[in-house]
Amino acid sequence: MKPTLKDVAKLAGVNFTLVSKYLNHSSQARMTPETRARIDSALKELNYRPSASARTLRSGKSRTIGLVCGDLTNAYSAHFANLILNFLREHGYQLLIAVRGSEADCAALDFLIDRDVDGLILSGADLPENYFPKLPTAVYDTSVNRGSVMNPDLGRSLDAALAAVNGRIAGLFFRNSAWNGAFQLAAHRRGLDAEARILPFDLETRATELRKVCQEKPEWILTSGWQTLLMLQDLLGDEFPGYHPHLLVHANCRGPFMNALEIAGVIHSNTGDMVRELCTMLLGQIENSGSVPESRLFPTVFRPAGSPEFEALKTRHFQLT
């Protein structure tokens, strides 16, 4: 059985209250150095660990952050979670992860909230309709203005990316993504024939939606995410060998797939920089209860195919930034 405070007190030969004050570093705990040494020895001998839930009840803080993310077998999801984990650990917090289902729902959020996390990190796509947690929350890539928001700064990079477009273009994005509205605004500014398509999380259903796009044969396709790009490239090679659209992609990585001739350019961003800003915003809310949620933009830049910066993204091995 797990040792209790009473077990520690009995072994140390002191009362229960004194052990509790010792553990809580109470200023009212008056005891001799010998008594402190006996309590410390008993704690070590019994390998006593304070109850996290009891500590949370006393302090009102669990020092734990909840993250809703995609399947951790996905390289980007694992990389993103690991960056957050490392940042939080450096600041005295732990990370609790809930993996979303095929579509956004409340289950993952409720799981984390029920475990008394101090705050939440989630993507805009993970926000169910008419639902928002009543605790500090940082949301990234979202068109929904709730909580502290971290969005890509897309104005200039999208204008630069769409400058070369001379035909119909389809934009492929996830639900609630900031990319959707930014893409449509940029396309409107340039007078382009553009359509935004919402992609599902589920890979099989996503492949079906990508297949529909290929059947419609837009001259240009812009997609937010390298995983969707790889799926699209496979479809083009296997099922639509005669269809060769120009591809624009948002990527936070380098890799051999950048060698594909159909890629006309990349809107590039750095996930590590974004995570630091996102976590800093959230911890600011948690540690300063009077602070209000804020919105920030993280930089993106367009790298046209053939430029030195684009060529630098063509690495032999896949690397996430």
Regions found by a protein language model. Name each.
Residues 116-124, 169-175, 197, 216-228, ...:
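Periplasmic-binding protein-like
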Residues 143-172, 204-211, 229, 267-289:
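Hydrophobic alpha-helical segments within soluble ligand-binding/sensing domains
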